[in-house]
Amino acid sequence: MEKRELVMACMNHLPIDRVPVGFWFHFPEGKKLGQPCVQAHLDYYNNVDVDMAKIMCDGYFDYPNPLAQSVQKASDWYALKPLGKDHPFIREQVDRVKAVRDGLRDPGLPVFYNVFAPFSSIRYGTSDELVMAHLKEDPKAVAHALDVIAEDNSILCEMLMTEAGCDGVYYCVQGGEKNRMSVEMYRKYITPSDKAVLSHANKFSPYNILHCCGWAGDPNNLEDWQDYPAKVINWAAFIEKMDMVKGRAFFGGKTVLGGCDNRKTGVLYSGTKAEVQKFIRGLIASFDSDTGYMIGADCTLPGDIDLQRIDWVLEAVHNA
């Protein structure tokens, strides 16, 4: 099967001839913006035979709304207005994706772009400490700000698919750590903006991936995101202690992506070729279905990983 046919069939629980594979990582300083960033993506995806491309939003983590830089008390958030579709923050990300898409040797390679949920955008644009303090001071004010940011993140998703040729977004939700807030608080104040963006993205593509991020190493309340309307779910299996089969059941039988520890202590980064391939064969053998499973990592791989290691995974998958 061609890569596009393979990935889309797997997402739709249709028969496939092998398990799809996708890995990605952040790029170093000097390759986070502009043409160097585009070229870094092309150097990877045109030379490593993975089945899908996830384009990074490196350089665009911070939400550059002027008001966000001057907020002092929680009630200040009520004055927040969207950046709008013509703001460079949005326009430049769309242009990045189009440039990568146009430069791929395989024009059929499925392409996804990393979009953060509003609760991540607001914290990157200010600080985690400030937002959490304001959430305690006036949670409705923060929820209002998240709704405004959701307008920008939603139009970004729309333009990525209508103008840049994205097949879907890789939608990253964060902030659900068990030690941060309760499920009830998250669902009341954070979930509405999370879902607003994802639901808008779903209007333009049915192939959106939900990434339940565990980058900090702290377990999340996965219940926060259990009912989110995404086609594919990815979570930090090694942080959450929830393997692929259990996770697929937890998320209602949706297609799942992952299975590999992204950390430097994991076998993918530190194991021998024999160890890596043994792990991958065991992972595939553990799946309880011939479709609906995609091999990837808990999160981004370390930027200094030897790309030959991804080739080892691909070799094991193709020979399985």
How would you describe each model-predicted region?
Residues 45:
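CN hydrolase (nitrilase-like) catalytic-core segments centered on the catalytic cysteine
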Residues 24-27, 49-83:
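Alpha/beta catalytic barrel-like cores
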Residues 1-35, 40, 51, 55, ...:
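Active-site loop segments of alpha/beta catalytic cores
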